[in-house]
């Protein structure tokens, strides 16, 4: 919001700031006064501060960046002969605070007003509270609505009582009322209108499905085990006249039958394979175990020159390592006597050397020869093909047999 002040010569303008404001510019009115300079002063805490000096033909306006907050006591004055215009704007944050306060006041007023519950939802809440008390009275009401003949037999009355008990056994009313209660407490007034429309559509769909339900209900009921049929109501056409049921009773009967159909055990032998699953898994594991054992049986230990023993843990498929070729390997070396690891290289480009050039121990020159890239070999080197009687103190003791696992990474 715009803020402005026109200052006349030699007049003091004093105020206690109510709304914070910002001064952005001071401009001289060149139609007033003479050519003498005009000084703009501001008084804060009893002290005079020069803001700017204006003069016709030289400086007639100056940009400013002055901010005054609520509660500040401030005065403005000029000592020249020209009118000076101070312009700026009110603090927008202050305006937002005012709007927030107004909104808060409006919200408080709305909260004080009693909430209005739609008549339809109010009826549902009352039904939820009185569900237990009305269970005994429901058969009479349903009979009145359906205009049952006065000369009905006692068996028909018993069937209606059993049907009512069957429908009331699941406490469907309570679930529906609880759901509507949650929706009413969390939704706005507009949402309640949408709910009414949805419920009307559901009622229309239920009316269309009523004829199908009369045929489906007996079929679903026949699938129940004998024990459950004894303890619940037989809803076949022979014992229940579906035409006497109200819409709400038909809906509740449909839900009841659907839930019982989900809970009943399968009779077509579907459950039996579940019990046999562990046996099937065990049978599947046996061939897999044989497959894993197969390569182990094929592993053969070979003894080559110098008493070196080799065993291919994995046969590669790449180029073959031959004498004179540069090979790159990952390896891990252990002492045979205690299985203590004394050296390894399992990261980076690997260990590189020329095979057969005596750059490594003799056991490696003969043990790695013949490997293919991608293969892994276990090499057992006797002392004579390793570090001999001297060993390599302090890591390798004298006369030590060494065991290496070597991965061939590349051959050049």
From Swiss-Prot:
One Pfam family linked to the record: NPL
Domain PPIase FKBP-type span(s) in chain numbering: 324-412
Coiled coil spans: none
Post-translational changes noted in the entry: Phosphorylated by a nuclear kinase in the presence of Mg(2+) and ATP.
Reactions catalysed: [protein]-peptidylproline (omega=180) = [protein]-peptidylproline (omega=0)
Composition-biased stretches (Acidic residues): 95-113, 169-178, 188-216
Chief location bin: nucleus
Stored SUPFAM superfamilies: FKBP-like
Organism whose genome encodes this protein: Spodoptera frugiperda (Fall armyworm)
Cellular location(s): Nucleus
Family: Belongs to the FKBP-type PPIase family.
Biased composition (Basic and acidic residues): 271-303
Alphabetized UniProt keyword annotations: DNA-binding, Isomerase, Nucleus, Phosphoprotein, Rotamase
GO cellular component: chromatin; nucleolus
GO MF terms held by the record: DNA binding; peptidyl-prolyl cis-trans isomerase activity
Region feature Disordered, mapped onto this chain: 95-304
E.C. code: 5.2.1.8
Keyword Flavoprotein: no
Name of the protein this chain belongs to: 46 kDa FK506-binding nuclear protein
InterPro entries, alphabetized: NPL, PPIase_dom_sf, PPIase_FKBP_dom, PPIase_Fpr3/Fpr4-like
Highest taxon of the lineage: Eukaryota
Compositionally biased region (Basic residues): 247-257
General function of this protein: PPIases accelerate the folding of proteins. It catalyzes the cis-trans isomerization of proline imidic peptide bonds in oligopeptides. Binds double-stranded DNA in vitro.
Activity control mechanisms: Inhibited by both FK506 and rapamycin.
